[in-house]
């Protein structure tokens, strides 16, 4: 298989959600283009970028969507979540309010996205450790309680950015491939594929055969 961008085995849509200013756009640009913009302004509307990675010899193309966390853009919610198989729920470790709003974002995600979506809680801007307002253990406990994976990242110095996307994409791939194997097994076990002939021995009597069925 070549390395062209249009050659892939799986295409996974992953959305970035969270308050405005937590660094979603820089996480996107750092992972897909290895770029960081210190003067990055809030995203207006929606944008997405792609990058392909290898998992178990398969090419996974990630289509990562980013939208503004500002309330006035929430009208795009339904289209934004449609088809998403993964979500990074991002907060700023130096701004406790962005962490407090995680619960609301999680509810919105579960209201609009597929029930099987894979969710990772991401504490971004870990380089601001001297300004930390959200303890790591507190966020990790919240993630465990709500069935989310958890990681802290820094788009500025690239800490754990690769790991965050690799982890969620690998988890999605495992779920999808296991489902495909399960579906294949079910198909193999279906009656049409497992027809067992039943041989009825002939009767010794010369009675005429009954051609109809009778309810008892």
UniProtKB/Swiss-Prot annotation:
The modification N-acetylglycine is found at residue 2. Its cofactor is Mg(2+). Keywords: Acetylation, Cell cycle, Cell membrane, Cytoplasmic vesicle, Endosome, Golgi apparatus, GTP-binding, Hydrolase, Lipoprotein, Magnesium, Membrane, Metal-binding, Methylation, Nucleotide-binding, Prenylation, Protein transport, Transport. GO terms for biological process: exocytosis; melanosome transport; neuron projection development; neurotransmitter receptor transport, endosome to postsynaptic membrane; protein localization to cilium; protein localization to plasma membrane; regulation of cilium assembly; regulation of early endosome to recycling endosome transport. It catalyses: GTP + H2O = GDP + phosphate + H(+). Residues 183-207 are annotated as: Disordered. Gene3D superfamilies: P-loop containing nucleotide triphosphate hydrolases (3.40.50.300). GTP binds at residues 20-26, 37-38, 40, 42-43, 69, 124-125, 127, 155-156. One of its GO terms (molecular function) is dynein light intermediate chain binding. It is a lipid-anchor. Its EC number is 3.6.5.2. InterPro entries: P-loop_NTPase, Rab_GTPases_membrane_traffic, Small_GTP-bd, Small_GTPase. Mg(2+) binds at residues 25, 43, 66. Residues 214-216 form a propeptide. A motif (Switch 1) lies at residues 36-47. The keyword Transferase does not apply. Regulated by guanine nucleotide exchange factors (GEFs) which promote the exchange of bound GDP for free GTP. Regulated by GTPase activating proteins (GAPs) which increase the GTP hydrolysis activity. Inhibited by GDP dissociation inhibitors (GDIs) which prevent Rab-GDP dissociation. A lipid is attached at residues 212-213 (S-geranylgeranyl cysteine). The modification Cysteine methyl ester is found at residue 213. It holds the Pfam family Ras. Its main location: membrane. Switch 1, switch 2 and the interswitch regions are characteristic of Rab GTPases and mediate the interactions with Rab downstream effectors. The switch regions undergo conformational changes upon nucleotide binding which drives interaction with specific sets of effector proteins, with most effectors only binding to GTP-bound Rab. Interacts (GTP-bound form) with RAB11FIPs (via their C-termini) including RAB11FIP1, RAB11FIP2, RAB11FIP3, RAB11FIP4 and RAB11FIP5 effectors. Forms a complex with RAB11FIP3 and dynein intermediate chain DYNC1LI1; the interaction between RAB11A1 and RAB11FIP3 is direct; the complex regulates endocytic trafficking. Interacts with EVI5; EVI5 and RAB11FIP3 may be mutually exclusive and compete for binding RAB11A. Interacts with SGSM1, SGSM2, SGSM3 and VIPAS39. Interacts with EXOC6 in a GTP-dependent manner. Interacts with RAB11FIP5. Interacts with STXBP6. Interacts (GDP-bound form) with ZFYVE27. Belongs to the small GTPase superfamily. Rab family. The small GTPases Rab are key regulators of intracellular membrane trafficking, from the formation of transport vesicles to their fusion with membranes. Rabs cycle between an inactive GDP-bound form and an active GTP-bound form that is able to recruit to membranes different set of downstream effectors directly responsible for vesicle formation, movement, tethering and fusion. The small Rab GTPase RAB11A regulates endocytic recycling. This is Ras-related protein Rab-11A. The gene is RAB11A.
